[in-house]
Design a protein with these regions (language model features):
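Short, contiguous alpha-helical
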Residues: 2, 11-76, 115-179, 184
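Residue-level preference for long, well-ordered alpha-helices that form the structural scaffold
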Residues: 6, 10-13, 83, 87
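General structural signal for secondary-structure boundaries
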Residues: 6, 31-33, 80-83, 103-107, ...
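Helix-adjacent hinge/juxtasegments
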Residues: 69-109
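Short acidic-hydrophobic surface loop/beta-edge motif
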Residues: 110-114
Length: 184
């Protein structure tokens, strides 16, 4: 296993993000459409609205990391997922783009993000730190909202240490990943 450096950390975080979303998505599949849309206590007051917010923001920042144009327009045109299944499929595709980016990432590279009145420029490592924080923050809200349903919230934080491979085996298999891809 390689020593921990920033590039390794970002690669591990991208994988952890995808695995957490996969676990969360599998739990969400047990909900009916009413539970997916039901009003709940949170900043975005439903599972659907919170998860669609995560996905829309992911698309924006991952697009910026990849140097894509038209990000503000794409964000404004974002079409929310009508079901947990649709969200899981689209989130997985987004997560795989992020994993691919982090596998080759230069944390010092500049990233441009168009805003209403300027273009924000930050290093890729800083953008990724912000993105991972955003995902974790809102995923925690989803976890809390899920606790108010008939579906038990899944474990999201006790399976990513290198010594915990036995806790993530099925999750890794769902992506076709091995330990070397995550930890080097």
């Amino acid at each position: 296993m390689n020593a921990m450096d920033l590039s390794s950390y970002l690669r591990i975080q991208a994988h952890a993000n995808a695995l957490s979303n996969q676990r969360l998505g599998q739990a969400l599949l047990a909900l009916d459409a009413d539970a997916w849309q039901a009003p709940r206590t949170s900043f975005f007051p439903s599972l659907a609205r919170t998860l669609n917010h995560i996905l829309a923001v992911d698309h924006y920042y991952i697009g910026a990391l990849h140097g894509e144009a038209g990000l503000r327009e794409a964000y404004a045109a974002f079409q929310p997922c009508a079901s947990a299944d649709a969200w899981l499929q689209r989130q997985r595709a987004s997560d795989l783009r992020l994993v691919a980016f982090c596998a080759q990432c230069d944390p010092e590279a500049w990233v441009e993000m168009p805003r209403a009145d300027h273009v924000q420029r930050d290093r890729a490592g800083h953008v990724l730190a912000h993105l991972f924080n955003h995902q974790t923050h809102h995923r925690g809200q989803v976890h809390a909202m899920l606790a108010g349903t008939a579906v038990a919230p899944p474990q999201l934080d006790e399976f990513m240490m290198p010594s915990e491979a036995h806790l993530r085996g099925p999750d890794m298999q769902a992506f076709g990943w091995d330990e070397a891809q995550v930890y080097g």
